Structures are given as C-alpha cells and as structure tokens.
Design a protein with these regions (language model features):
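Intrinsically disordered, low-complexity, mixed-charge
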Residues: 1-165
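A phosphate-binding glycine/aspartate-rich beta-alpha loop in the early core of alpha/beta enzymes
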Residues: 13, 192, 200-267
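Amphipathic alpha-helical segments in well-structured domains
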Residues: 28, 180, 209-213
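Short acidic, glycine/serine/threonine-rich loops at helix termini
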Residues: 60-61, 97-98, 115-121, 168, ...
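Solvent-exposed alpha-helices and their adjacent loops that cap or buttress functional pockets
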Residues: 77, 98, 127, 158, ...
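Phosphodiester-processing cores and adjacent nucleic acid-binding clamps
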Residues: 99-102, 128-130, 149-152, 162, ...
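Structural motif
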Residues: 104, 113-115, 163-165, 191-194, ...
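N- or domain-start disorder-to-order transition segments that initiate the globular core
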Residues: 160-189
C-alpha cells in the first residue's frame, strides 16, 4: 500500500513466501529496498529471488492470497516460538483490556510458532490452533491490516482460545477462579507443579525452600546438575546473580534463552 503496488503475497509449503507485484519500476525498487531494510523485527530473510513476469492478470489491490503447498527451497525454515512482547505484556496487565490476565495472549511479534505447527504452510488450519475457531473480536483484528494481530495465526482470547486449568496429581480438576494464581500459591507453599507449556511439561518448584528442591532433584535424578531458574525481572535477578550488558541483552531478547551466570555474594536461593 505504501508503494502503491498491486498483486498478492502468499505462504509457500516450504515456509517461503511468494510475492507477485505490479506497478512502476521505481515503486517496485522502493518496495524491494523496504523489504530488505525495513522488515519486521522478527523477520529473517535468507534470500530474495526476483524475476520479471509477463502481466497475464490484472490486480485491483494488494492482497494476502490462499497459501500454496508448492515448494521452491531444498529445505524448510520453521519459525521459532517467541517470548511475550512488551505490548502484549501491557495488555495482559491492563484490567480494561479484553485479554487481561489471559495466559495465551499473542500477536505477530510474539507467541508460539514451532511447537504449534503440524505442517506447512504456516496457516492456522495447519496448527494446533485449528481446534479453536476465532470469535468475531479476534477475527476483526486478524483481518485488520493496521492491527499488530493482522494474520497472526495464534490469535485468541478468553472467548475463543485455550483455557488454563489446574488438577491434582490424580487428574481431578481443582475448581478455582484463577488456576494460574492458584498454582503460584501451591508453589509458594512448597508444592511441585507440572506446567504444560507449548512443547511439553516443566516440573517447577520454589527456589527458596529446601524440601521441594530436594524432592525435585530425587524425582529428576539430578543430584548436582543445576536447574534453570525463572525470575520476574532483571531487578530481581540482581539480588542473587551477577550479569553484564551482554547477559542482560540475551535474557530480555525474544529468545529468552537459559544463560549461565555467576552467583552474587548475597546469593540466597536453595541449593
């Protein structure tokens, strides 16, 4: 729209993208320049191949077309899962927002990709989200080209998306208003909780009580091997670990990797 071009874009069966555009040469050149230099923050372009085509079809607009299962590449590039973005985090905490406190909040800048994809091309019908048809509210965002959830394949809300629930270790459901807050309370009291994430289960316990940690080590057969520690923020991390700018950059990146750090002098977590 910015460069006044017409045509279409569509996903391909190898996770590539096909773009067909018509317009003035200068506008097409500007588009290709923007494609390389002003791509979305999460986009990674491995290769751009262009070719001139005879204009066999007239286009009235630029649209997103139905995906194709055709492949052009020798392999596939599957997008990774991405940690929650700052905008979704703000919405998550805003009581006036429709997705307030919704654990599965996502947009085009964050959320699951790799672990929800069942096959390519990357469309909702080819992911685990096919079991959750969008409500009218989510569909309007999905169709709005000015919205950051425009064609976000995992878009969902409390009305149409997955629901969180809490069970006893025997599988019986615990009937509570907020399963996530209830699970947090159990953790604080010393319980071990199995959290089902995008790609499997995480066994977690509090880091400040010795008994649950000893029990978790016995359960996992990890007498000495370190566990990964989740922390609320860099400010909290400063209270028990040392890190520099590079570590801080990694910890707050969209990858959110596990980073090995030195204990601080005032380290207080259980061993």
């Amino acid at each position: 729209m910015k460069n006044k071009l017409k045509g279409y874009v569509r996903n391909m069966g190898d996770a590539g993208v096909e773009i067909v555009i018509t317009g003035k040469k200068g506008d097409i050149d500007n588009f290709l320049k923007d494609l390389r230099e002003n791509k979305p923050s999460l986009a990674k372009i491995h290769r751009v191949t262009t070719s001139a085509m005879k204009e066999t079809e007239k286009y009235d607009d630029f649209t997103i077309s139905v995906s194709s299962r055709k492949t052009e590449l020798s392999g596939s590039v599957i997008p990774p899962d991405v940690a929650i973005c700052d905008q979704c985090l703000l919405e998550l905490k805003a009581e006036s927002n429709p997705r307030y406190d919704y654990f599965f909040i996502t947009c085009t800048d964050c959320g699951p990709r790799f672990t929800t994809i069942e096959r390519l091309p990357y469309d909702r019908k080819n992911t685990t989200m096919k079991a959750f048809p969008m409500c009218d509210f989510c569909r309007e965002e999905y169709k709005d080209s000015s919205d950051r959830r425009f064609h976000a394949q995992t878009v969902a809300c409390t009305n149409c998306g997955p629901e969180a629930y809490l069970t006893e270790n025997n599988g019986s459901v615990i009937d509570v208003k907020s399963p996530i807050r209830e699970a947090a309370a159990h953790l604080s009291e010393g319980s071990i909780v199995a959290i089902k994430g995008y790609g499997g289960f995480h066994l977690v316990c509090t880091t400040t009580k010795e008994k649950p940690l000893i029990r978790l080590r016995a359960t996992k057969h990890r007498k000495q091997k370190p566990f990964a520690v989740m922390t609320h923020s860099l400010e909290v991390l400063k209270t028990f670990a040392e890190f520099g700018d590079r570590e801080a950059e990694l910890l707050t990146s969209y990858i959110r990797p596990i980073v090995v750090l030195r204990k601080s002098e005032n380290y207080f977590l259980s061993e």
